[in-house]
């Protein structure tokens, strides 16, 4: 796992087309913005896990 430190307003670049920007920090919450092409799915982990569980149920 790569661990990086960013300040508010700073950006990470993933590949050629994805950027992740730190928008704000309040207490233990960090707001981030993600710019990615439409063909790249971006989900919070808990939403992604729910989607995967639903896909698994449909296969059963």
From Swiss-Prot:
Gene Ontology biological-process entries: mRNA catabolic process; negative regulation of translational initiation; positive regulation of translational initiation; regulation of carbohydrate metabolic process
Chief subcellular location: cytoplasm
InterPro entries: CsrA, CsrA_sf
Subcellular location(s) per record: Cytoplasm
Pfam families linked to this entry: CsrA
Transmembrane segments: none
Record keywords, A-Z: Activator, Cytoplasm, Repressor, RNA-binding, Translation regulation
One GO cellular component term noted in the UniProt record for this chain: cytosol
GO molecular-function term, one example from the UniProt record: mRNA 5'-UTR binding
Sequence similarity: Belongs to the CsrA/RsmA family.
Role summary: A key translational regulator that binds mRNA to regulate translation initiation and/or mRNA stability. Mediates global changes in gene expression, shifting from rapid growth to stress survival by linking envelope stress, the stringent response and the catabolite repression systems. Usually binds in the 5'-UTR; binding at or near the Shine-Dalgarno sequence prevents ribosome-binding, repressing translation, binding elsewhere in the 5'-UTR can activate translation and/or stabilize the mRNA. Its function is antagonized by small RNA(s).
Assembly with partners or alone: Homodimer; the beta-strands of each monomer intercalate to form a hydrophobic core, while the alpha-helices form wings that extend away from the core.
HAMAP family in the cross-refs: CsrA (MF_00167)
NCBIfam families the record matches: csrA, PRK01712.1
Matches recorded under PANTHER family: CARBON STORAGE REGULATOR
Stated name of the protein: Translational regulator CsrA
Organism: Buchnera aphidicola subsp. Schizaphis graminum (strain Sg)
């Amino acid at each position: 796992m790569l661990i990086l430190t960013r300040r508010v307003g700073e950006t990470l670049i993933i590949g050629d087309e994805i950027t992740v920007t730190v928008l704000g920090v309040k207490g233990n919450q960090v707001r981030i913005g993600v710019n990615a092409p439409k063909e790249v799915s971006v989900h919070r982990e808990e939403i992604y896990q729910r989607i995967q569980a639903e896909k698994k149920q449909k296969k059963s």
